[in-house]
UniProtKB/Swiss-Prot annotation:
Intracellular or extracellular location(s): Cell membrane
Protein name: NADH-quinone oxidoreductase subunit B
Quaternary data: NDH-1 is composed of 13 different subunits. Subunits NuoB, CD, E, F, and G constitute the peripheral sector of the complex.
Binding site for [4Fe-4S] cluster: C68, C69, C134, C163
UniProt family annotation: Belongs to the complex I 20 kDa subunit family.
Pfam families listed in its UniProt record: Oxidored_q6
Membrane topology summary: Peripheral membrane protein
Organism: Buchnera aphidicola subsp. Cinara cedri (strain Cc)
Cofactor(s) the protein needs: [4Fe-4S] cluster
EC supergroup of this enzyme: translocase
A GO CC term assigned to this protein in UniProt: respiratory chain complex I
Length: 225
């Protein structure tokens, strides 16, 4: 049995305010909202892909070096290696115009405030590559005047082993950084949330993979064999 609702006393003034001829069918607002979210979600996905594609293929390094590893870094800009194939041949003399910084060499304690200052002057998004054993862990300089790893005061994205590493290793680090950038999503630094604006706490790769590294270093006991 079907039931229908009819307006009572159609000649009343209420019917003039809500006449029958103005009634029309409307779509479900929930379904419409879901459709819009899927549509704009797809657009934002492609827009994010385009932004990451342009960003990873136009990485401008900051012209900054500390010691001998910088010579190997600059060698990658020669015609033999041709780093311009990866869109990273434009050296910037100002940190405000650079996309990433390469810590190539020994980070002395006296230079740590300068490196930190230059990193703070770089605009977001920005990345850091630690090049060489000295920048990674202090290298052979286990002394009071050398910082035992630049990740003590900077968030490092890519580590390049070697003393000194070859230019091919630096190019490999650029390709790894490009892969990491292609997977990033906004926001990268400052976040506008419900509780206000706050800065994203970026941890270094060394801190994030600390447990994994310790599990590899620890040797299994004899009972485990």
């Amino acid at each position: 049995m079907k039931y229908t609702l009819t307006r009572v006393n159609t000649k009343n003034s209420i019917s003039k305010k809500y006449p029958l001829r103005s009634l029309k069918k409307t779509s479900d607002p929930i379904k419409k909202q879901i459709k819009n979210n899927i549509f704009f979600g797809t657009i934002s996905k492609y827009m994010q892909y385009i932004m990451n594609w342009g960003r990873k293929n136009s990485l401008w390094p900051y012209n900054f070096g500390l010691s001998c590893c910088y010579v190997e870094m600059v060698s990658a800009f020669t015609s033999i290696h041709d780093i311009s194939r990866f869109g990273s041949e434009v050296l910037r003399t100002s940190p405000r115009q650079a996309d990433f910084m390469v810590i190539a060499g020994t980070p002395f304690i006296k230079m740590a405030p300068v490196i930190q200052r230059l990193y703070d002057l770089m605009l977001e998004p920005k990345w850091v590559i630690s090049m060489g054993s000295c920048a990674n862990s202090g290298g052979m300089y286990d002394i009071y005047s050398v910082v035992q790893g630049v990740d003590k005061f900077l968030p490092v994205d890519i580590y390049i082993p070697g003393c000194p590493p070859r230019p091919e290793a630096y190019i490999h680090a650029i390709t790894l950084l490009q892969k990491a950038i292609s997977k990033e999503r906004r926001p990268l630094s400052w976040i506008v949330g419900e509780q206000g604006v706050y800065k994203y706490n970026m941890l270094s790769e060394k801190e994030e993979k600390n447990k994994k590294r310790i599990s590899i270093i620890n040797i299994d006991s004899e009972d485990s064999f």
